[in-house]
Amino acid sequence: MTNRELASPKRTGRPRNSGRDSANPREEILKEASRLFTAQGVAATTISQIAECVGLRQSSMYYYYKSKEEILSALMEKNRESLTLAEKLLEEDGPVAPRLYAFLYTDVRQLCTAPLDFYELEVAALAQPQVFAGFEEDGDKLRDAAAQLLALGVDSGELRQTDPAATALMLLSLNEGAQHRLWHGRRDEEKASANSAALAESVADYHLSSLLADASSLAAVREAGRAFVTEYEDDEPAA
């Protein structure tokens, strides 16, 4: 599902076509590209449109990104938060249910606040596998990590009996559907940020309420799960 280790090569020079100033031209390009992809779709967006929005000549874009596919690859790299957290949570000790809650909450929130609707990214990745070589592999790793957490929860007695692999696929598919509905209903980052945390909590609550062996423990699981999320965020390096 989420993003990948396809960083663009670092280049020097930054000729610009306007007086706009940015301490990080690459980030500015990604932000404007995401806005255009969201507004009119990936296929309809051209590299020249992105360059114009950023204030660069199209030829100058090549100092940063050589193609629209390279921009998409960089955006994909930004969507690995869920997988990174899942791998960390598998290394933790103690109750499993809060770790599963933290993973599911983070997955929904990350999908909702990513620069691009996951479905748009998936279409681009499947159409050009040579450009997005890590996309399917990361998706497999994410499902496997979710299945491992589920299996641990079943073994510990915290979760009801379930098929970990099938349930992991279902949970992640529901998360993707939830983010798509949020993306479909808005076209600006501010609205996404305002709604993503609430949606993430609702979806994680829904998942855990159906999985917990003791449904009455949901409030405690939520509190402990959110503590994991906060700890993870505090450990993240500053941008």
Segments (PLM) and residue ranges:
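Hydrophobic alpha-helical connector segments
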Residues: 74, 88-117, 168-171, 200
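Helix-turn-helix
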Residues: 28, 36-70, 74
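Short secondary-structure transition hinges
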Residues: 108-151, 158, 165-166, 193
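Short, basic, alpha-helical segments at the C-terminal edge of helix-turn-helix-like DNA-binding modules
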Residues: 77-84
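Short, hydrophobic secondary-structure boundary micro-motifs
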Residues: 118-122, 162, 184, 218-221
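Short coil/turn segments at alpha/beta junctions that flank glycine-rich nucleotide-binding fingerprints
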Residues: 39-43, 93, 114, 156-157
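C-terminal peripheral helix-coil segments that are non-catalytic and often amphipathic
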Residues: 2-12, 140-155, 180, 184-239
